[in-house]
């Protein structure tokens, strides 16, 4: 038994294929989905969605969204997504380093700047993790 997994961004379908397992970056932590999972609707955070298909893991950087699980179908609607195998690792490292420096340089009383820098940092971290260049932070 397997899952049917669809990852859909506003501009394209990122993934649509059978899988044995999915790990979602929910707003409350990592959420593992296996065949036979109970129906579920969950908000997603910025992070890495992982899909196990044909004994291989595929990482997808996602920037928030929602996931629905029902009858062995996992439908993931995301604000933006990028497959890890399509991300240039060196570019992702440079973007992460730049976002980290920007976050460190924001003044403590600059709430809007801090928010924007934090969002950029989280996006860059998710992309780097999906590309395989960062295990954990």
From Swiss-Prot:
GO-annotated cellular components: plasma membrane-derived thylakoid membrane; proton-transporting ATP synthase complex
- Cite the entry's keywords alphabetically: ATP synthesis, CF(1), Hydrogen ion transport, Ion transport, Membrane, Thylakoid, Transport
Q: Has keyword ATP-binding?
A: no
Supply the InterPro entries for this chain: ATP_synth_F1_dsu/esu, ATP_synth_F1_dsu/esu_N, ATP_synth_F1_esu_C, ATPsynth_dsu/esu_N
Q: Which CDD domains match?
A: F1-ATPase_delta (cd12152)
Instruction: Please give, as recorded in its UniProt entry, the membrane topology of this protein.
Output: Peripheral membrane protein
| GO molecular function per UniProt | ATP binding; proton-transporting ATP synthase activity, rotational mechanism
Subcellular compartments: Cellular thylakoid membrane
Task: Work out whether the entry's keyword set contains Thylakoid.
Answer: yes
This molecule's function is given as: Produces ATP from ADP in the presence of a proton gradient across the membrane.
* HAMAP family attached to this UniProt entry: ATP_synth_epsil_bac
Q: Which family does it belong to?
A: Belongs to the ATPase epsilon chain family.
Subunit-structure text = F-type ATPases have 2 components, CF(1) - the catalytic core - and CF(0) - the membrane proton channel. CF(1) has five subunits: alpha(3), beta(3), gamma(1), delta(1), epsilon(1). CF(0) has three main subunits: a, b and c.
Q: What is this protein called?
A: ATP synthase epsilon chain
What species is this protein from? Synechococcus elongatus (strain ATCC 33912 / PCC 7942 / FACHB-805) (Anacystis nidulans R2)
| Taxonomic path | Bacteria, Bacillati, Cyanobacteriota, Cyanophyceae, Synechococcales
